[in-house]
């Protein structure tokens, strides 16, 4: 078996993209993101590669949407999970800063 070289961010995106639920469907359907200092270089690039299916071992693209507000992204991810009867979910990421705490507040739902 050949060695696959990935950065930590690429490995995380690849890992998220292959998680399956009990029905055999993709569990993490995509990612909401606000890019800024702290996550634009590593994670942003890995999500871009995942969006276009350019990461080794990915069989289908990993969608990424750019959000405008951290709390809204978290609420959207929660609504998606509830609409799918919690059989599927969305990942959410933002840069480090005051907006990141808004995701924690939204997660209290």
Where are the regions that the model predicts?
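Thiamine diphosphate
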Residues: 1-101, 105, 109
């Amino acid at each position: 078996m050949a060695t696959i070289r990935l950065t930590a961010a690429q490995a995380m995106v690849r890992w998220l993209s292959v998680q399956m639920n009990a029905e055999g469907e993709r569990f993490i359907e995509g990612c909401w993101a606000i890019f800024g200092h702290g996550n634009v270089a590593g994670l942003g690039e890995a999500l871009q590669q995942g969006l276009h299916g350019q990461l080794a071992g990915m069989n289908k693209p990993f969608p990424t949407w750019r959000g405008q507000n951290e709390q809204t992204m978290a609420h959207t991810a929660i609504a998606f999970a509830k609409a799918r009867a919690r059989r599927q979910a969305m990942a959410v990421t933002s840069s480090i800063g005051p907006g990141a705490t808004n995701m924690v507040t939204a997660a209290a739902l």
